[in-house]
Amino acid sequence: MKVSLASTSEYSKKAAESISDLSPNAADVLITSAITSMVTDLGVVAPTSSGLLTYYDGVSNSSHTIDAYFVAPKNFNGEDKEQHKITMTYGGHVETCKGANTFAVPGIYKILQFLYENFASIPLKNLIEYPIMISNEGFKLAQPTKDYFKHSLEPMFMWHDYSSKVLSELKNNLDEGVVRLEKLSDTLIQFSNEGFQDFYYGDIANSLIETIKNEGGHVTKDDLETYKMIKDSKFNLNYKDLNIIGHAGPSIGSLMVLKYLEVLNLNTDNKVKLLENLYNARKNNYEFFGDRAEFVKKEIKNIISSPSTIHIGTSDTKNNHFSLTFSSGYGSGVLCKNTGMYFNNSLGEIELNPQGFLGDTKGERLISNMSPIIVTNKSGIFTLGSPGADRISSAIAQVLTNYISNKNWIQSINMPRYHVNQDGNVRAELGLQLSSVNATYTEEFDMYFGGVCVTGLEDDLFAQGDPRRSNVYWIN
């Protein structure tokens, strides 16, 4: 069997290569690549990430979605209720919060367990062998982590004693410093023996809760044990000559892709203003807590009736396709001594918590812009997705718009992009001419504009990464 991979994580390709002699399928490659990314892509993701999965099952010829995004604890009864706010120059200016009290319940291991039980063909010990090895022997930083750590290493990852010790080699040399996560290696061995559910019910869960409690966090054992995925809250939209499958809520990411597509394909000179209005509509109307799923579904029906993240996509020749985007926020800086797992800071992402820090979100699914999708047309089936915070939707929509015109994924990914911010300011890559707009132009292939990855099966397997995010792709 042949398998293809496209990713924004440099080490994911090495993970795929590590099992290539075992005749892996698309699920096998996705599992080992995702775990490896959570080890190596420090700050970009972490071993306490959450994700959204969209996939196509080649046996049943059906598409599905799984929402395993962060959920707030049922109560905020931990000792630390202070907002430990920090400021970083990453992406211009970012305010976020650090500490164990920003930790939300992650769902990535529910996805990995589901994939392993239903689609994997290789024993779990083999799938986790490479991430166990690299976490124990050590690794140098990939470029996206270097770019992030230039801004975040001191304020976010050096305040915590254990984290500061583990990352000590990076203090003076981001390029050559080696990170070793021996405790995380032990935890991965535990996963290989007991399965991913140990994160929610077993010894790993107990170790996490001990650290959370000792450091003032709010997540409890009950919060871990009662975490549930949301299956098949999806839409299936015919748009021009494409069929697009994605999440219909409570995540708002796919809704925003469709709305960006709608504006980008209008024949108007007022496109920039319409994109500014769309950005503000998202902030003002879509980012709320409550029944977002029903709201998002209604918004998608209206479209149908009117004309810090990682992404990994995998496909195989048995027509299985997996599109996974996952995140840990900006990272909390907390490194759990017993498990070697860095904690997420999803309760502390200020821009995604409009109710305020530790506001009325108890037990709620948090807000996500992620949008892993499946696209089908007469020529084949494809996975698409991107990291990039609030640029995820605009990046994917521009690539889809390009593909509708040129039917070439490589050209569609490589064409210059632009993004309209909340205040109407436009940022664009060189080579793009925006008439009557004062835009700030960046260099070609700027990582600001996401990293759209595509895999698929036409006459043969296909994979293409994005030069904005390391251009990682692989076919065995």
Describe each PLM feature range:
Residues 1-194, 199-201, 206-240, 248, ...:
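Noncatalytic scaffold domains of N-terminal-nucleophile
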Residues 284-291, 364, 396, 403-446:
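Extended C-terminal subregions enriched in glycine
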Residues 187, 200-226, 284-300, 318, ...:
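Amphipathic alpha-helical
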Residues 36-37, 45, 49-57, 310-315, ...:
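Short beta-strand scaffold segments in enzyme catalytic cores
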Residues 259-327, 338-339, 439:
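Internal maturation/activation junctions in enzymes
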Residues 39-65, 218, 320-382, 405, ...:
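Active-site rim segments in enzyme catalytic domains, especially the processed small/beta chain
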Residues 230-231, 306-309, 368-370:
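Short, small/polar residue-rich loop motifs at catalytic or cofactor-binding pockets
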Residues 246-249, 255, 375-392:
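Extended C-terminal regions of large enzymes
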